Amino acid sequence: MTNIRKSHPLTKIINNSFIDLPTPSSISSWWNFGSLLGICLAVQILTGLFLAMHYTADTATAFNSVTHICRDVNYGWILRYMHANGASMFFICLYLHVGRGLYYGSYTYTETWNVGIMLLFAVMATAFMGYVLPWGQMSFWGATVITNLLSAIPYIGTNLVEWIWGGFSVDKATLTRFFAFHFILPFIISAMVMVHLLFLHETGSNNPTGIPSNMDMIPFHPYHTIKDILGLLLMLTALLVLVMFSPDLLGDPDNYIPANPLNTPPHIKPEWYFLFAYAILRSIPNKLGGVLALVLSILILAIIPLLHTSKQRSMMFRPISQCLFWLLVADMLTLTWIGGQPVEHPYIIIGQLASILYFSIILIFMPLASLTENHLLXW
């Protein structure tokens, strides 16, 4: 008799995805972040669902409803801070996941990579809209500044912005629609995750060497399930330490001031995970140019498979490319720091140089380094 796990139409899908899935034996802990992202998504959907039961998407009561959740709802404070800091963990895992893909050449699985880029955009949109919901000062002004960027689009820009706002400024209509979108997007993201996994399981996982590992596979369960659980425990420990000891560490104090359209905060800035893109946006003195640079800073990931000039897939045995990769990481950290600083000397010039370096590394230096390495190996 066949095992029901392998014969039943529903359990068969789960079995082939998480239990009997052939996995390379050599994949390191950098491959844990996919499962961690799945868990982050589940945590965000669950905490978000319970928060939505007590939240009101109305400009008059939104700020007070969040205060009510923290003060009066049973364990509301932990729900709120798990959700807010869970977003930070989500982005830490996301950036590490993308970095892993860049380093080990996982982007050569173009379908999986492109769905991943769409997922990144969807998660960024969701996080931005979620940041608007508490209706504090930074929520309101962040929404105003970021939606206003669309007015840089020639001809249709102004109409587009007013259409998104549902009026002539960020107001009740904007908050209501942002709540609706913030609620629905995670479920769309969940469906996209399925597509992401579908494409991944067509090819199988990459591994640190970048060499096909068809002759050396092990079942996903129990080996990688145990390994993923270790990663999960470490991530949950970090998240709970953050939530219990310093829940406001990554937030902005200005968001504890109710939104006031008549009073602009001294430094309008997004959450820390968008600061690198915000720094690139600010470093170009032209509005349309800045918006294009902002979009391209993420969209540039889509052309990385086309820029792969190396004869090797992974960077494991390519020291010049490795140096450039870590320079890119340092550059992104620099941009993140600059994004949180005021627009004044010397931060302006540092931001501009870091932005130029960001695009130069990806578009020019990395492809050239790969060609150089090919030449040095006499390939």
UniProtKB/Swiss-Prot annotation:
Required cofactor names: heme b
Superkingdom: Eukaryota
Predominant place of localization: mitochondrion
GO molecular function: metal ion binding; ubiquinol-cytochrome-c reductase activity
GO cellular component, one term: respiratory chain complex III
Positions that bind a ubiquinone: H201
Additional remarks: Heme 1 (or BL or b562) is low-potential and absorbs at about 562 nm, and heme 2 (or BH or b566) is high-potential and absorbs at about 566 nm.
Protein name: Cytochrome b
